[in-house]
Amino acid sequence: MVQPLITRNIPAEFLTANHYIFGQTLVSNTGMLGLLCDPTSSFVELNDSSMARIVKPDKIINYASSMWLVKNQIVCVGLGKPEYIGSTSLARSGYTRVYQYPVQITTPVYEIQATLEWAGRFDFSIVMSEGSNPFLTLYDVKTIASLFPALNVETPVMLFNRRFLDSLVHVKRGAESKG
């Protein structure tokens, strides 16, 4: 007998190069990471969503009962709970020790301060190339739009599309408070 696929709606904040979108999306037991990494679909469907320009994030330009986003255009996805990511086996494989690395990430539009959990020693080339999954999981995230400081997104967990990365700085402990 085939087991039914468990599905649930989860709230998520999507950032593209020009828009801030908040809505709910239907995910299976593989969570948001499974949805974003599904090679059989190039889009994400949102329900009960609102869209704002990053220039004025407090001014909603559109409410929609259904909206579709192209996965390749999603810079990052903010989630309210780490459980929404999905299976930890998708996020990381094996039984290795995971270390926390404070990082500062820049994209053409956003600056992100977060904690990257990574197995083993921090090596930028491995972080950027490991696996076929384009999304990195970041924790305790603070995101601002460089040119539009009114946009300020703080979330416990975020999936970041590494295709949009301009720079990544491993912030040494103790140096985080400087700035």
Question: Model-derived features: where do they sit?
Answer:
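Conserved RNA-binding domains used in RNP assembly and mRNA/RNA metabolism
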Residues: M1-G179
